[in-house]
Amino acid sequence: MAPSEKKLTEDKKNSSLNKKIETSNSSSEKSSENNNGDSQNNEAPKTFKELGVIDELCEACEKLGFKTPTPIQQEAIPVVLNKRDVIGLAQTGSGKTAAFALPVIQELWNNPSPFFAVVLAPTRELAYQISEQFEAIGGSIGVRSVVIVGGMDMVTQAVALSKKPHVLVCTPGRLMDHLENTKGFSLKNLKYLIMDEADRLLDMDFGPIIDKILKIIPHERRTLLFSATMTSKVEKLQRASLHQPVRVAVSSKFSTVDTLIQRYLFFPFKHKDTYLVYLVNELAGNSIIIFARTVNDTQRLAILLRTLGFSAIPLHGQLSQSNRLGALNKFKSGARSTLVATDVAARGLDIPLVDVVINYDIPTDSKAYIHRVGRTARAGRAGKSIALVTQYDLEPFLRIEATIGKKMQEYEIDKEGVFLLSERVGEAQREAIIQMKEIHDRRKSKGKLHTKRKRDDLDREEQIY
């Protein structure tokens, strides 16, 4: 028996703790849903304990700074504790990872076993962050989580699987690889399957692989499906994988949160970089994510800002897995105050305390805008977003305003202060062009373009430009 399983088992034998667990479970059975499968929670609980969460996990929540349950946590946790399948719909930044991690860990506490739960995630970064959440919440009771994603060594992962962790957090392609090829690995005792960002999983064409996984894993299991939107593909997956699910919809409307202050700046296209630098300078001391449309602009803007003395770092799909994780960790730790990213960072990544989101490029898809600005003002906190609008962006910008049902106010600036930066920004632009050419030349000389594609390519975060 693995040490963490032994710890869980020994703790469970404590009779007084068993009584507390039984009390928590019985209270969760009284809260929840009607026979139609709709969540009914007339009086929202104010604490995790009122949701049926045991004291040990309530203490973990307190240490992590989870003061009160978010709406999706209030709705989903009692239903999962009542051993029902769940389909959860919630806007971005709602705290849904803890909404499934807490009750699953509590069930693991009651019935410790290896390969207790599998979480499917659309991207590698999201998989690592979900795993971190499981270990942060369940670390005090010995919960072990392993990440199984593409781009990493199969043999090393097989060794990790042989140690029989409690929770696997996977991208679908690599999980299927191990189910087919890793000797001795099976999910025959799986108790929970969780699909996070289900709409994105299906948008990235993981559907056929998920269908294969569903045929292999036990039918007698609980399934939790979380999605930002209810698409026809998600509805089809729900019918195929969930048994009489309870639907918990915190927000059925695709919208931004109320704590987000949204502003825009309008100016001629030729001054775009200068306005960006002005903003980053004005917002110095804040944690900032800048979203650009292409990998090239992401890299160029990071170089431009660094040349001007700002601690910026790029994040995009052409970086190696280790470099992507390194960029995220530097930004999350505060070692870099500005992250310049493509839409690889727009969904799923749990980056705490992002103060400002700047849309350097206005996305043509209004939903992409909502996911981007959802990186700030998360879980009840305040945040700010600023959209850079040129004469070429008016149509998509007006569509975004129509989608969110709000007219944005213009961000107040000192225009004279903007143009005082023009000369310095021009010099930095020229330096960025030189460095970009050097980067492209190095890539060409190393011959890094690969034409052969494997299943792991489905685990990529976005198209390579």
UniProtKB/Swiss-Prot annotation:
Entry-linked InterPro entries: DDX47/Rrp3_DEADc, DEAD/DEAH_box_helicase_dom, DEAD_box_RNA_helicase, Helicase_ATP-bd, Helicase_C-like, P-loop_NTPase, RNA-helicase_DEAD-box_CS, RNA_helicase_DEAD_Q_motif
Reaction(s) catalysed by this chain's protein: ATP + H2O = ADP + phosphate + H(+)
GO molecular function, one term: RNA binding
Residues spanned by motif DEAD box: 196-199
Gene Ontology terms: cellular component: cytosol; nucleolus; nucleus
UniProt biased composition (Basic residues): 442-453
Motif (Q motif): 46-74
Swiss-Prot/TrEMBL GO biological process terms: rRNA processing
Chief site of localization: nucleus
EC number, as in UniProt: 3.6.4.13
Keyword Ligase: no
Cited function: ATP-dependent rRNA helicase required for pre-ribosomal RNA processing. Involved in the maturation of the 35S-pre-rRNA and to its cleavage to mature 18S rRNA.
Family, similarity comment: Belongs to the DEAD box helicase family. DDX47/RRP3 subfamily.
UniProt free text on domains: The Q motif is unique to and characteristic of the DEAD box family of RNA helicases and controls ATP binding and hydrolysis.
This protein's name: ATP-dependent rRNA helicase rrp3
Organism encoding this protein: Schizosaccharomyces pombe (strain 972 / ATCC 24843)
Upper lineage: Eukaryota, Fungi, Dikarya, Ascomycota, Taphrinomycotina
Gene that produces this protein: rrp3
